[in-house]
């Protein structure tokens, strides 16, 4: 009667509507897994592919955390305590602070930062080691900019006019700067003032501190008392006032520091020397000073040439962010200040579906003809230091406002590259699938190349170029939302099957259409390979991966950076010679070999060995040349020419007889379907 009832055991039914969609197994003959889910397969394939490389000397150094002074024990600070502590700090290796387009430290500076050279040896002639021999060789006329000041006592500069209204700043810079929020901007200024006050209070009362230690551990000489300006811990010394004014009041000091901080965060140097002032100040050629003019309006095409310029000829810490430094000849690219009014910027590309205005204002760059003039303008100080927050502020001006995490969901990682990862996401409001490229700003080899991901794809739109929808700054990451091409990369296809000549011609014609358009706008892709070619399910071919591209112009007609993927690099890139758009044609020729043979030349060699063979040997040949027609061999020979001047252009190749075999995009659909079938089933 009172016995406890047994609970009924729950009945578990068999699965309903069960479908065995995924079955993963290992093929011992091929030595690989088969039947993996697409996102897993993409990750494995990505890890096997060679990664693009960047010149190691151009890798952006990570900004060091500010050093905290810890006083232990019962030591009582004396009059020389602070100065002695600063001398000890100066011997620490803090020379690797983050700079945009900064040159690697010279051997002299590395020895100084490690304490191998004494202070007296450095103070004997510090200006001798401000530039490396390479920079003096490539820029004999002295390409200098003192964006944040930096003149020794007695050397005056023309002051930068204070912006009185939003109309005073070009390209809508005032509106963009206000979008950052007054609290954020004022907070940065207050931190700068607090650091400045700590530096000034470290000296005994009544005396001026003999030396000020910058962030990079390099001594900066103080000016005389009648010309002394407050030293910003972020942007270096100030620009001297005209008219022989004395020391400014504390209120003027604060406003001046805020102004210089604003300029260091948002102003850059263009490739042109045009001035926007109606009354330009001529540049004296025989006096040891430099003249500067207000910012000018600039097109977004010239912006990229400034933002992603080659860093090989630029000394560390001498330029402000987003400067151009690659030049083919000093006579053509280095110009003195013009005496006339502004020059019109290059108009938007003719083939672009929509026109956008540049969102970064730029200042003018003037080149003194006498190297001693530039040295006097710099005053032996490091002026081009860009902190992580300043770089984020500059990047924030070219991206869209908002938080994409509120608009997207269902993230699935589908790939990984040298700059970040790629995820597949779904838009909440439309249900459309988009590809999201997420790049951590702190983990970039060259963070300034991130501007390419935004500016190039935004301003240059073409039927054969992957469309970019939006770009956002999410915390410490740059998110770029692009169209999702479900056909995958060309690499996936050619690794499984071989293309016939009609299919090869169809791919080449689409890529050449994109290159002809980009080259006409002065854009060099610099990473053409099968991984950068994406396909849609209906067989359309599109060019992607603009993270390593560069822009050339009349003022910067050539580049010199070692950028690209080793097996596809042109000989002139490997040999560090000046190059232009011809390097993309060579890489396309290597990609044609890849479509015929299944892999690029020298793929079994190490990347370094392959680069040596590409640089020193004759142009590579097809392994199976007997399998292709003579017209395809001639098409390939027009691209793989060692002399860039003799190499065919993209427009010339579009008229080649081989492209008469070009078929409709549907001819590539069987290849896409075959690959998807092989990766989804055993």
UniProtKB/Swiss-Prot annotation:
ATP binds at residues 414-422, 437. Coiled coil: none annotated. It catalyses: L-seryl-[protein] + ATP = O-phospho-L-seryl-[protein] + ADP + H(+); L-threonyl-[protein] + ATP = O-phospho-L-threonyl-[protein] + ADP + H(+). Keywords: ATP-binding, Cytoplasm, Kinase, Nucleotide-binding, Nucleus, Phosphoprotein, Serine/threonine-protein kinase, Transferase. It holds the Pfam family Pkinase. Its EC number is 2.7.11.1. The active site is at 527 (proton acceptor). CDD domains: CRIB_PAK_like (cd01093), STKc_PAK6 (cd06659). The modification Phosphoserine is found at residue 561. Residues 1-30, 132-170, 200-256, 270-367 are annotated as: Disordered. This is Serine/threonine-protein kinase PAK 6. Residues 408-659 form the Protein kinase domain. Autophosphorylated. Phosphorylated by MAP2K6/MAPKK6, leading to PAK6 activation. PANTHER family: NON-SPECIFIC SERINE_THREONINE PROTEIN KINASE (PTHR45832:SF3), SERINE/THREONINE-PROTEIN KINASE SAMKA-RELATED-RELATED (PTHR45832). GO terms for cellular component: cytoplasm; fibrillar center; nucleoplasm; postsynaptic density. It is an enzyme of class 2 (transferase). The gene is Pak6. Residues 26-407 are annotated as: Linker. Belongs to the protein kinase superfamily. STE Ser/Thr protein kinase family. STE20 subfamily.
